[in-house]
C-alpha cells in the first residue's frame, strides 16, 4: 500500500492553515535575514584555495580536507556530464554568498568526518534521469567509514532547481532531496546540523522503486538517539510529485527518525 508522509513543520504558536501564505513567508524571510547576519562572520581567506572558474570545481576532489572559497559566481552550463562531484569531502567550502548555477549533478557525492558548507547559492540546477548524483547539494553524509567522528555543518545554503528522476535506479531503493539525500550517522561523537537553509525545487519521480525517501531538506536517515541530527530555521518550497509505491515524501524530510527540527517551514505540493 502506498505510503506518503507529508511533513509541514512550523515552530510557531499558530496553525499554518489560519495564516495567509504571503504573511508567513514574509516573516520567515525577515527572520532568515537576521539569522544570516548573526552567523556570517568576517573571515580571513588567506589560507583558502580559491574557486573562481568551472574548472576550479575539480579542486574539491584533489584535497578533500582542504579549505575552499568561491571568489566569483560559477556557471556550469557547459559541463553537463563531465563534472565529477566531490567524494569523501571533509573540508570547508565557503561560498561567500556566490552562486553555482546550471549544474546537472549534485555538488558533493559524499561528505564524511568533520566538514562545513556555508554561504552558498545553487541556482537553476537541472538534474535528469541520466545525470550523476541523487540530490542538488549533497548525495550522502556518511560517518560509517572507519568509525569517523566529528561535526558537519551546512549553513546559509539556498538551492533552486528541478529534477526528473523517473528512470533513475529503476526498481531500487534510494532517496532524493534539496540539501542532502541521505544522512548516515550512529554515534554520540557524530553530529550534523543544517541551519538557515532554503530550497525551492521541483521534483518528479516514477521509478517503480520501493523504500524511496523524498524530502525538501533531507531525504532519509540511518541513525539512532545517540547521534545528533538537527534541522533549524529552514524553508522548503516547490513540489515533489511521486507515483512510487511505498515512497515517503515530506516537505522537510522524507523519513526522519530521531531528527530535531526547529523553526522550519514547508509549503510544497506533494
What is the predicted function of each stretch?
Residues 10, 14-18:
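Hydrophobic core
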Residues 1-8:
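Positively charged n-region of N-terminal signal peptides that target proteins for export
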Amino acid at each position: 500500500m502506498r505510503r506518503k508522509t507529508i511533513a509541514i513543520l512550523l515552530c510557531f504558536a499558530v496553525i499554518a492553515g489560519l495564516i495567509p501564505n504571503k504573511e508567513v513567508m514574509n516573516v520567515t524571510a525577515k527572520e532568515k535575514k537576521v539569522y544570516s547576519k548573526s552567523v556570517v562572520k568576517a573571515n580571513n581567506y588567506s589560507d583558502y584555495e580559491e574557486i573562481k572558474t568551472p574548472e576550479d570545481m575539480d579542486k574539491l576532489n584533489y584535497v578533500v580536507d582542504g579549505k575552499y572559497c568561491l571568489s566569483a559566481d560559477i556557471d556550469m552550463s557547459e559541463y553537463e556530464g563531465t563534472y565529477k562531484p566531490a567524494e569523501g569531502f571533509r573540508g570547508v567550502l565557503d561560498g561567500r554568498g556566490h552562486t553555482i548555477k546550471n549544474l546537472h549533478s549534485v555538488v558533493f557525492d559524499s561528505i564524511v568526518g568533520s566538514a562545513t558548507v556555508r554561504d552558498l547559492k545553487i541556482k537553476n540546477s537541472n538534474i535528469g534521469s541520466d545525470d550523476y548524483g541523487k540530490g542538488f547539494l549533497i548525495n550522502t553524509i556518511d560517518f560509517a567509514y572507519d568509525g569517523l567522528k566529528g561535526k558537519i555543518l551546512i549553513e546559509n545554503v539556498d538551492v533552486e532547481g528541478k529534477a526528473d528522476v523517473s528512470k533513475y535506479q529503476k526498481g531500487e531503493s534510494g532517496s532524493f532531496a534539496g540539501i542532502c539525500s541521505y544522512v548516515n550517522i550512529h554515534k554520540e561523537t557524530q553530529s550534523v546540523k543544517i541551519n538557515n537553509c532554503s530550497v525551492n525545487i521541483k521534483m518528479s519521480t516514477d521509478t517503480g522503486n520501493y523504500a524511496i525517501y523524498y524530502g525538501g531538506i533531507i531525504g532519509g536517515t540511518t541513525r539512532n538517539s545517540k547521534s545528533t541530527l538537527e534541522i533549524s530555521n529552514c524553508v522548503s518550497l516547490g513540489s515533489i510529485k511521486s507515483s512510487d509505491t511505498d515512497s515517503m515524501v515530506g516537505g522537510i524530510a522524507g523519513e526522519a527518525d530521531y531528527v530535531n527540527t526547529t523553526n522550519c517551514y514547508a509549503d510544497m505540493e506533494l
